[in-house]
Amino acid sequence: PLEGGGSVEFQGEAADFAALHRRLGGVQMVLQDSQAALNPRMTVREAVEEPMRLSGCFQDGAAERALEDVGLFACDSFLTRHIHALSGGQRQRVAIARALTMEPALLIADEPTSMLDPSGKANLLRMLKGLQNNRGFSMLFITHDLDSALKISDRLFRLEKGALTRLNPNDYIQVRFDGLFDAG
């Protein structure tokens, strides 16, 4: 139960997120700040394989496949690089690859483009939508950026003052005009 009422269900059952992120086909999350989300002393291989090792779901080759799916060449010289030596865009892709190794049914992406330049943002949005189409997972894309939301989303919802409202396409112009998605 949620404060004020309501509940969260996943695949028809009460959601236990402590368990769901530890199993294949569960829920994975990509955070806004990949620098804080990834251990800077780990290598790329260690960071991407960590969720599988912690959950006991290790699969040979899963890290390499996930890295290639996000556009990172999984050669030995890249796999042995430390997280702190990567660019912001590379770190965000490693964070996404890390989530993909667990073959999520639901990927929660919390402001994944906020720390990227416009080109990096556009590339990441295209990549995420392509991954969603190819791998078949659902995605909850959390953002203040209406343009990004319009590019990647099949359905839009607005959370305002604790109320969740589904927007229909006719609402998008009004939302943009009202500035409801401005972070300021």
Name every feature range the model reports, one short phrase each.
Residues 60-77:
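Conserved ABC ATPase "signature" region
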Residues 103:
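Conserved catalytic motifs of ABC-family nucleotide-binding domains
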Residues 33, 42-54:
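Q-loop/switch helix immediately C-terminal to the Walker
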Residues 2-3, 13-28, 42, 54:
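ABC ATPase NBD coupling module
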Residues 82-86, 90:
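Conserved ABC ATPase signature
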Residues 107-110:
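Catalytic Walker B motif of ABC-type/P-loop ATPase nucleotide-binding domains
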Residues 159, 163-183:
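Conserved beta-strand-loop-alpha-helix hinge in the C-terminal portion
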